[in-house]
UniProtKB/Swiss-Prot annotation:
The lineage of its organism: Eukaryota, Metazoa, Chordata, Craniata, Vertebrata. InterPro entries: NDUFS6, Znf_CHCC. This is NADH dehydrogenase [ubiquinone] iron-sulfur protein 6, mitochondrial. The modification N6-acetyllysine is found at residues 90, 112. One of its GO terms (cellular component) is respiratory chain complex I. It is found in: Mitochondrion inner membrane. Mammalian complex I is composed of 45 different subunits. This is a component of the iron-sulfur (IP) fragment of the enzyme. PANTHER family: NADH DEHYDROGENASE [UBIQUINONE] IRON-SULFUR PROTEIN 6, MITOCHONDRIAL (PTHR13156:SF0), NADH-UBIQUINONE OXIDOREDUCTASE 13 KD-A SUBUNIT (PTHR13156).
């Protein structure tokens, strides 16, 4: 739940102020999506001695933030992440208030009720 609240808080920031994307530590090492970065003298850096640390630069939070809010007609929406083996358990999201945007706790997709 804390991740959803953090995600919502980040989405309210102006695009220039968001901290999305690959960041680099003071030592020049890329920081992963989990914030993993090692000190210069950390023994765990031995696995990157003769090779570069590979970090996927397409963080999921960046990709979800680019998705537009889905406008739906119903008051309650069911999200299953696309269904099948690639989806997630079905969750139901209430969209009762006019200004409310419902966010799926699994995949981060946002839904808003289209009022006539």
């Amino acid at each position: 739940m804390a991740a959803v609240l953090t995600f919502r808080r980040l989405l309210t920031l102006p695009r220039a102020a968001r901290g999305f994307g690959v960041q680099v530590s003071p030592s020049g090492e890329k920081i992963t999506h989990t914030g993993q970065v090692y000190d210069e003298k950390d023994y765990r850096r031995v696995r990157f001695v003769d090779r570069q640390k590979e970090v996927n630069e397409n963080f999921a939070i960046d990709l979800i933030a680019q998705q537009p809010v889905n406008e739906v007609e119903h008051r309650i929406i069911a999200c299953d992440g696309g269904g099948g083996a690639l989806g997630h358990p079905k969750v139901y999201i209430n969209l009762d208030k006019e200004t409310k945007t419902g966010t799926c706790g699994y995949c981060g997709l946002q839904f808003k009720q289209h009022h006539h």
